């Protein structure tokens, strides 16, 4: 079985509870002496086996790291791990999932070695927002309900508002709407990408 590690939680001295996103589930497993295994870090893709335990959580066994070359680059790894942490907070408490969550991570991980990490992550996020029906397709400010003009600001969840209402940096409305439609950052300048990343860090 394969999955992405979204969170690890230390218990006792060296044991870990790990949360792993697989094709259709968010699994919670237990690993004895998990802190001794450097592979058990947020964002890692692993192959593993699950061993049932009638008294406690299922155990994580026979771990194999399915690594990527970009994991050696600290900046790419940082952005990736941050996105995985945000995704876990969004999915926490859910057990069964549509495969799009795993597939989006898998696709993004394959792109990360060749593309700008923030562009990859923002496109992943837009893909998931679109799947969840959360990409805004109406042309009004969520704070005052008045029509949006050429410039907009983004709140958590990429909800649109007037810059004067939200008191934050303005972005071009047409570019943001194109990003929502295509889930592609190709038309966005790097400064706009960085602003979207700052908004994403507020949470899913």
Positions of the model-derived regions?
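Non-catalytic alpha-helical scaffolds and adjoining flexible linkers that form interface surfaces
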Residues: 1-14, 21-204
